């Protein structure tokens, strides 16, 4: 990071950090943006050291500008960052990124006018391309520089690591900037695997070549001296044309950009391959119940890049489906933000949803609702399991226990009042299973009837039959005594009720 931090001097760094990212926005450029730009340039096989000078930034802008129409958001952000850095190097006062882009556009228009004026003064109106890999040597001839092994290695590495994910297309566009059809075929031939995808790409190229031949028929008659023949579809694809013919078409006046045409065909085929390798539709991307909102947004935009739709349709998908397919927790938060909320505000609001803190808050809210409902039931008298009031053994008052009693501690046993033992060891008046003190010297145990009440009115039998009913009962008692002489209960439970 130290080397990347040396891109700007102290004074230039102060100016850099005063420039805003957007007009009227609060965020400003920081050192991390330069670090990110240098890493992106390394990923695109471009020397990050070019950022240290204004001329290097101008070269980077010249390579990135043709890809802005078909490039990704990362490519546009890289272009904007380098453009702003160029203004800082050139000591051009700008307030935000938009103003820096306007300054770059003005400077490019001025340079074009100067070049046209110089060509008119010298009598040479031919606008010769100076773009890499076609350069002009010291003799003024246009020569071709073969694509470097480093570029090929970067392309093969991307295909091996990413297969045919959506980010492969902007990577191919950046690596093939200014390339001839022969260079593009070299890049395609270095792909060893994924032959099914390569076959699909060949079919797309053949279809586009046939469409080119249909729209651009060959003019009848001989070719004028000094003029080149018109390229056919197979010539643009590099199968029936030589390298010198390709350079001639690209540097002719007016030029025929066979390299850019062939590149568009390849990108069209790559889009079909990306759609095949990413079968998931944007409509199927939904946030899981425990998935962080950040991971859901990453999956959403990755699938959105593979969708073959216009930018207006993609904007509608983002505004509608991103909120609609979120989980209930995030959807509630996003709807509360309103339709004009930015992605940064959405991610900040849903940052903790699904994590332990959010779960704890939801659980606390649920518990508070349950507690409130229980309180309402108790107030209405529907709560039956009311706790019994406790009573203190020390002071005899209710509402607290002896452990929390503030009264002076009573000495001795709390049950019998004697000293020398505690209540748990007290043997005074220990109750048996019948609920009374045992042994008892007062007759029968407590669960027996102590006295039988005598009836105050004669029974129904005595009223009906008179003395006939009373005589057998009087005779039955001595018979029972004679048959069961040992049946007295006195020996077991004290006084026998039959002997009373």
Curated annotation (Swiss-Prot):
Which Gene Ontology MF annotations are present?
Answer: RNA binding; structural molecule activity; zinc ion binding
Region Dimerization/Multimerization of capsid protein p24: start and end of each range?
Answer: 277-363
Q: Which GO terms describe its biological process?
A: viral budding via host ESCRT complex; viral translational frameshifting
Q: Which GO terms describe its cellular component?
A: host cell nucleus; host cell plasma membrane; host multivesicular body; membrane; viral nucleocapsid; virion membrane
Region Interaction with host AP3D1, as annotated, extends over 12-19
Zinc fingers classed as CCHC-type: ranges: 390-407, 411-428
- The segment annotated Interaction with membrane phosphatidylinositol 4,5-bisphosphate runs over 73-77
The segments labelled Interaction with host PPIA/CYPA and NUP153 in the record are 189-227
InterPro entries hit by this protein: Gag_p24_C, Gag_p6, Lentvrl_matrix_N, Matrix_HIV/RSV_N, Primate_lentivir_Gag_pol-like, Retrov_capsid_C, Retrov_capsid_N, Retrovr_matrix
Q: Any keyword Membrane?
A: yes
Q: What else is known?
A: HIV-1 lineages are divided in three main groups, M (for Major), O (for Outlier), and N (for New, or Non-M, Non-O). The vast majority of strains found worldwide belong to the group M. Group O seems to be endemic to and largely confined to Cameroon and neighboring countries in West Central Africa, where these viruses represent a small minority of HIV-1 strains. The group N is represented by a limited number of isolates from Cameroonian persons. The group M is further subdivided in 9 clades or subtypes (A to D, F to H, J and K).
Q: What is this protein called?
A: Gag polyprotein
Species source reads Human immunodeficiency virus type 1 group M subtype B (isolate YU-2) (HIV-1)
Give the source lineage, highest ranks first. Answer: Viruses, Riboviria, Pararnavirae, Artverviricota, Revtraviricetes
Q: From the UniProt record, report the name of the gene that encodes this protein.
A: gag
